[in-house]
C-alpha cells in the first residue's frame, strides 16, 4: 500500500501563510465542527485542498477537475462570482447567480433555491452561505438595500449563529464563530445600519452585537492575525453607530485600538477610513486638537496614494465603500471545502484511486495523513502513480512540504521571523534554540520533514550570522547555496518548472542579495527574476508568496537603477507599490517611493526627488520603515544642493 498521496499537495496552507488552526479550517467546516474534531495543538485531521498542486505543473482547479469535476465546476463558479462582486460587475454577477445549472443560487421564480440535498461533495451550508451572500451583494449594488439586508441575514443563519441573537453567554456562544462567520455577521450588521439610519432602537441592538464581537475578538486569546484582519471592520461600524447615537466618547477606545493594530501589524485597507473616523470623533467632542497626530498620518497616507495614482493611473480600493473593502479582506480567501468526512469523496474511485478513511489518532497526531491504496485498475489509469510520475518521485520516496508539528513550533517560527525582521538578532537566535528543542520533542514525522525543518533553521542562522557581521559575504553565499541544495537544484535549467516553497524562494532572494553586495548586479537580477517569473507565471495570490514578490520587485527596481535601466526600474517600482497596497498591507510603499526618489536624483530631477523623499519621510511614520533615516539624510543633502545652485 502506498501512503501519503498528499505529498506536496495539501500541506502548504499550514506553513506558507502561518495559518492558525481556526484559519486553516475556515471555509472547510464550521467552528463547532473544528472544535469537535480538532481541539488542541494544530490537531488537523482534514486539510484543505485548494493550496496544493503547483508541483504538478497545473493549478489546483486542474487537479480538482481531475479528482472531482463537480467540485471543479463549483469552485470555478465561486471564483467568478467573487471576482464579479469585487468589480461591482452586476451583469456578470446576475448571470452567475441566475444561471440555470446546478450552481446558480436563484431559481426561475427569483427565490433562493434550497440545495442542501444535492450531489456536491462540499458542505452544503457553507456553499449556500456564500451563494446567498453573493445574492445580497447583487441586491446592494442595484440599490435594493432592504432585500440585501434580508438575504445577508439568511446567509448568516446557514451556520447557526444569526446576528439578531442575544447571547446570554457571549464567550460560550461566539467562540464558535470562524473568521468568515464573523465577517458575515459584520456585513449583515452593516446592511442593518444602512437600512435603519433613523431607527435608534435598531442601531442600539446592532451596536450591542458589534460590541460583543469587539470584546470577543480582542480579548479571547484569538490569533493576532485574525484580530488584525477583522477588528478594524467591527470597530469602524461600532464607532459609526456610537456617533449616530450621540455617544462619540464610547468610540474613542476602539478607534484608537484599530489604528494601533493596523500600524503595528501593517494593514492599510481600512486605515484611511479609520483615521477619518477618529478625526470626526474628536471634532464631535470639541477636542479636535487631540487628533493632530491622526491628521498628520492621514495626510501622509494620502500622499502615498496620490503618488501611486500619479505613477500608475489608479489606486487599489479607490472609491470602495465599507462593504466592498470587507469583501476584499483575506477572510474571503478561505476555500469552500468540506468536513473531514466529506472531503474523502473528493478522492473517490476515479482514474483508479480508492480511499481509506483518514485515521484519527487518539491524541490527534499531526502525523495522521490521507491513506490511499493503489487500485487494481490498469497502470495508466492509476492516478497515484500518474502523480508520482509527473513529480518524478521514485516509488517509496516521500516529499511532503513542511508544516510544524505543534502549535508551539508554529508560533515559534512566526516569532523568529518577526524578530529577524525587526533586527532583534539575539532574540531570534534564542527562539531558534527553543524551536529546535520543540521539533525534537514533538517529532516531525519523517526524514524529509526533518530535512525541511533543518533547512529553515540553517537559513535563519545563516541570516543572523550575516546580519551580525560574523561571516563574510562570500561565506554567506556559500552557506545559502548549500542550504538551498538540501531541497532544490538551483542550477537546473528547468528550475522554472519546479515547484518552489516559500522558504526556498526566500533563500533564492538571499542569494540575490549577496551577489548585489558583492557587486555582481547581473547575477542579482537573475536570481530575483527567478522569484518574480515563478510567482507571476502562476498568478499566486497567497500572502506569503506576495511578500517574497515584494522583496524581489524592490531588488529588481534597485538593481536596474544600478545598471542605468531606469525604465525597467520604474516598472518594478509601480508593480511593487500597487501589489503592496492592493494586498492590504502598505508598509513597503515607502520603500518603493524611496527607490523612485533615488533614481530621480541620479537623473538630476532634483525637485521631483526632493518631493518623493518628503513623502517617504512622512510615510515612514505610519507603519515604521527603515528607510526614514536614509530619506532624511538624502533629503537634507539634496535640499542643500538645490539651494546652493540657486545662489
List each language-model region with its residue ranges:
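Short C-terminal boundary/hinge segments that cap the last helix of small helical domains
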Residues: 57-75, 392-410
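DNA major-groove recognition helix of helix-turn-helix/homeodomain DNA-binding modules
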Residues: 47-62, 380-398, 643
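Short alpha-helical DNA-recognition segment
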Residues: 16-36, 351-371
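Amphipathic alpha-helical repeat scaffolds of TPR domains
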Residues: 72-82, 124-141, 173-198, 228-240, ...
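A short, Lys/Arg-rich alpha-helix, primarily the initiator
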Residues: 1-18, 320-351
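Amphipathic alpha-helical segments of tetratricopeptide repeats
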Residues: 97-118, 153-166, 207-222, 255-267, ...
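Structural motif corresponding to the intra-repeat A-B loop/turn of tetratricopeptide repeats
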Residues: 87, 142, 197-200, 245, ...
Amino acid at each position: 500500500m502506498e501512503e501519503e498521496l498528499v505529498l506536496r499537495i495539501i500541506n502548504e496552507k499550514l506553513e506558507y501563510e502561518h495559518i492558525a488552526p481556526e484559519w486553516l479550517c475556515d471555509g472547510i467546516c464550521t467552528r463547532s465542527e473544528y472544535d469537535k474534531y480538532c481541539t488542541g495543538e494544530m490537531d488537523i485531521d482534514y486539510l484543505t485542498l485548494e493550496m496544493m498542486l503547483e508541483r504538478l505543473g497545473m493549478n489546483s482547479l486542474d487537479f480538482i477537475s481531475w479528482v472531482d469535476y463537480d467540485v471543479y465546476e463549483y469552485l470555478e463558479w465561486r471564483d467568478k462570482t467573487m471576482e464579479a462582486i469585487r468589480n461591482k460587475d452586476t451583469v456578470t454577477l446576475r448571470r452567475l447567480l441566475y444561471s440555470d445549472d446546478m450552481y446558480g443560487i436563484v431559481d426561475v421564480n427569483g427565490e433562493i433555491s434550497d440545495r442542501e440535498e444535492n450531489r456536491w461533495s462540499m458542505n452544503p451550508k457553507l456553499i449556500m452561505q456564500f451563494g446567498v451572500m453573493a445574492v445580497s451583494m447583487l441586491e446592494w449594488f442595484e440599490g435594493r438595500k432592504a432585500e440585501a439586508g434580508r438575504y445577508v441575514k439568511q446567509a448568516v443563519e446557514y451556520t447557526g449563529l444569526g446576528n439578531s441573537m442575544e447571547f446570554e453567554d457571549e464567550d460560550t456562544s461566539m467562540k464558535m464563530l470562524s473568521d468568515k462567520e464573523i465577517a458575515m455577521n459584520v456585513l449583515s450588521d452593516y446592511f442593518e445600519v444602512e437600512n435603519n439610519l433613523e431607527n435608534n432602537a435598531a442601531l442600539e441592538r446592532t451596536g450591542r452585537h458589534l460590541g460583543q464581537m469587539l470584546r470577543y475578538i480582542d480579548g479571547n486569546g484569538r490569533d493576532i492575525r485574525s484580530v488584525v484582519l477583522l477588528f478594524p471592520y467591527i470597530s469602524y461600524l461600532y464607532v459609526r453607530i456610537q456617533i449616530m447615537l450621540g455617544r462619540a466618547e464610547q468610540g474613542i477606545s476602539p478607534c484608537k485600538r484599530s489604528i494601533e493594530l493596523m500600524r503595528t501589524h501593517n494593514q492599510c485597507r481600512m486605515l484611511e477610513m479609520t483615521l477619518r473616523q477618529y478625526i470626526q470623533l474628536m471634532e464631535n467632542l470639541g477636542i479636535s486638537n487631540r487628533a493632530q497626530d491622526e491628521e498628520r498620518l492621514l495626510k501622509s497616507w494620502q500622499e502615498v496614494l496620490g503618488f501611486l495614482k500619479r505613477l500608475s493611473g489608479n489606486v487599489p480600493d479607490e472609491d470602495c465603500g465599507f462593504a466592498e473593502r470587507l469583501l476584499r479582506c483575506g477572510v474571503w480567501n478561505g476555500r469552500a471545502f468540506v468536513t473531514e468526512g466529506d472531503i474523502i469523496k473528493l478522492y473517490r474511485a476515479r482514474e483508479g484511486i480508492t480511499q481509506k478513511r483518514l485515521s484519527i489518532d487518539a491524541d490527534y497526531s499531526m502525523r495522521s495523513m490521507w491513506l490511499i491504496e493503489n487500485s487494481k485498475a490498469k497502470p495508466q489509469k492509476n492516478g497515484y502513480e500518474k502523480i508520482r510520475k509527473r513529480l518524478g518521485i521514485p516509488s517509496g520516496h516521500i516529499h511532503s512540504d513542511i508544516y510544524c508539528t505543534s502549535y508551539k513550533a508554529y508560533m515559534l517560527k512566526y516569532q523568529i521571523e518577526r524578530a529577524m525582521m525587526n533586527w532583534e538578532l539575539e532574540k531570534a537566535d534564542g527562539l531558534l534554540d527553543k524551536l529546535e528543542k520543540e521539533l525534537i520533542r514533538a517529532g516531525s514525522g519523517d526524514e524529509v520533514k526533518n530535512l525541511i525543518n533543518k533547512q529553515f533553521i540553517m537559513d535563519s542562522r545563516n541570516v543572523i550570522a550575516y546580519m551580525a557581521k560574523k561571516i563574510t559575504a562570500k561565506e554567506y553565499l556559500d552557506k545559502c547555496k548549500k542550504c538551498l541544495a538540501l531541497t532544490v537544484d538551483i542550477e537546473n535549467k528547468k528550475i522554472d518548472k519546479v515547484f518552489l516553497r516559500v522558504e526556498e524562494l526566500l533563500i533564492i532572494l538571499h542569494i540575490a542579495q549577496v551577489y548585489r553586495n558583492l557587486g555582481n548586479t547581473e547575477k542579482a537580477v537573475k536570481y530575483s527574476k527567478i522569484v518574480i517569473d515563478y510567482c507571476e507565471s502562476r498568478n499566486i495570490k497567497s500572502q506569503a508568496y506576495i511578500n517574497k514578490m515584494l522583496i524581489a520587485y524592490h531588488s529588481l527596481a534597485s538593481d536596474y537603477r544600478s545598471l542605468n535601466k531606469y525604465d525597467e526600474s520604474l516598472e518594478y517600482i509601480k508593480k511593487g507599490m500597487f501589489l503592496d497596497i492592493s494586498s492590504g498591507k502598505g508598509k513597503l510603499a515607502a520603500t518603493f517611493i524611496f527607490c523612485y526618489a533615488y533614481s530621480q536624483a541620479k537623473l538630476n530631477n532634483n525637485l521631483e526627488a526632493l518631493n518623493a523623499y518628503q513623502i517617504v519621510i512622512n510615510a515612514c511614520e505610519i507603519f515604521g520603515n527603515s528607510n526614514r533615516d536614509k530619506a532624511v539624510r538624502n533629503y537634507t543633502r539634496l535640499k542643500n544642493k538645490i539651494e546652493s545652485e540657486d545662489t
